């Protein structure tokens, strides 16, 4: 089972990771970057990024994204350093 939700990122997100969840971010609006394990990747509308379990990540910039979480999003599986 998966979940899909829209997220409005207004400020740079805090670096975090998930132990069990894979996420796919699809950028709907805005221009910014995704930071994956310290590597920055430029994103713009219709860019997509797959984030595997254990990957420390964050979004940088003002973005509207579609977040696809597999399995479905569980706030208990959100870990911060």
PLM-predicted stretches and their roles:
Residues 38-54:
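Short acidic-glycine-tyrosine-enriched beta hairpin
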Residues 20-32, 37:
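Glycine- and acidic-residue-biased ligand/ion/polar-headgroup-sensing regions
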Residues 53-78:
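Ligand-binding loop in jelly-roll beta-barrel domains
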Residues 18-20, 61-62:
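Short glycine/proline-enriched turns and hinge-like loops at secondary-structure junctions
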Residues 1-15, 21, 68, 77-79:
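A short glycine-rich, His/Asp/Glu-containing loop-to-beta-strand
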Residues 24, 40-42, 56, 62:
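Well-ordered beta-strand positions in beta-sheet-rich domains
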Residues 5, 28-29, 44-45, 61:
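A cytosolic small-molecule/anion-sensing beta-strand core signal
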Residues 9-11, 45, 53, 70:
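Active-site donor-binding loop signature of nucleotide-sugar glycosyltransferases
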